[in-house]
């Protein structure tokens, strides 16, 4: 039997979401006023970070199965900030604290500093409607 390859792995989702977060942070930095798009951008960043945070354990499961505990723990520690920043950003959005949103988005941009996005990317605008989705949760 041949191996079954899952094209939608957690690692690929994390890479795609990381690029989308970088794009959203750049767009959020361009915003001059707090409109619906700014709310969508901030909500999308929070939701995407939460999704990344939730996928860390499944990424690490294969390493733990092979007893690579140090590598697994290092990976967890490397991505621990994602869930924390997602929660802080969510609280800042719900309390309309846009100064904190700006500060957190700058910190998030620093975390994703090494990610390069091509000019002709195919990411689109994944943040459209994210605020409604965040409020609905």
Where are these regions (language model features)?
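Short terminal alpha-helical segments
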Residues: 1-42, 46
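Unusually extended, aromatic-enriched hydrophobic runs near protein termini
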Residues: 25-31, 60, 128-137
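Short, charge-rich, low-complexity alpha-helical interaction segments
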Residues: 41-66
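Amphipathic protein-protein interaction modules
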Residues: 57-118
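Alpha-helical oligomerization segments
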Residues: 109-137
């Amino acid at each position: 039997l041949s191996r079954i390859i899952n094209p939608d792995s957690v690692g690929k989702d994390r890479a795609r979401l990381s690029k989308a977060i970088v794009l959203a942070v750049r767009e959020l930095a361009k915003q001059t006023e707090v409109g619906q798009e700014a709310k969508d951008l901030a909500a999308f960043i929070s939701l995407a970070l939460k999704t990344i945070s939730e996928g860390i354990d499944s990424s690490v499961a294969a390493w733990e199965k092979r007893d690579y505990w140090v590598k697994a723990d290092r990976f967890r520690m490397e991505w621990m900030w994602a869930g924390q920043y997602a929660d802080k950003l969510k609280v800042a959005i719900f309390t309309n604290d846009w100064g904190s949103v700006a500060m957190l988005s700058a910190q998030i941009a620093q975390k994703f500093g090494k990610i390069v996005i091509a000019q002709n990317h195919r990411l689109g605008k994944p943040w459209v409607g994210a605020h409604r989705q965040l409020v609905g949760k």
